[in-house]
């Protein structure tokens, strides 16, 4: 089944890719590797985990940030079915110093990629806490993909 059809079946909508500021790109292809720059979940998810958001809300924010990554992936390579393997996911979590559940938050993105791509969605991952992220975002995600 096509990835975009899976998204619809899951009740999820692929957002429109947001143009990157001048001099940058949302994603850059080098050979068969696609580097996806940092994506946040949007203005509805501004704040800190451990203070403004629960782990469950962070999970949903990571899922939304991943959807925003997928929008730029589609804009760059034309079709989400051209992803051969998700190689690496880097999830940055804006959190309080005592918050230690970054992996559980990052699972929002990991689970989505697994649901969409199956074994090809399995990836190496880092989930780290940050004292701040751009524009107060709760989550920022970067990805590296192998494409067909």
Where are these regions (language model features)?
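Short, polar/acidic, helix-capping and beta-turn segments at strand->helix junctions
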Residues: 1-148
């Amino acid at each position: 089944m096509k990835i975009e059809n899976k998204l619809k079946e899951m009740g999820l909508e692929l957002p429109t890719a947001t143009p990157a500021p001048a001099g940058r790109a949302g994603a850059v292809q080098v050979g068969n590797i696609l580097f996806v720059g940092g994506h946040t979940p949007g203005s509805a998810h501004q704040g800190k985990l451990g203070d403004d958001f629960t782990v469950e809300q962070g999970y949903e924010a990571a899922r939304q940030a991943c959807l925003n990554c997928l929008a730029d992936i589609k804009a760059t390579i034309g079709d989400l079915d051209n992803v051969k393997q998700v190689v690496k996911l880097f999830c940055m979590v804006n959190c309080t110093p005592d918050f230690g559940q970054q992996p559980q938050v990052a699972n929002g993105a990991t689970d989505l990629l697994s649901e969409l791509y199956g074994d090809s969605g399995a990836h190496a991952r880092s989930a780290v806490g940050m004292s701040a992220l751009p524009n107060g975002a709760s989550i920022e995600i970067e990805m590296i993909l192998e494409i067909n």
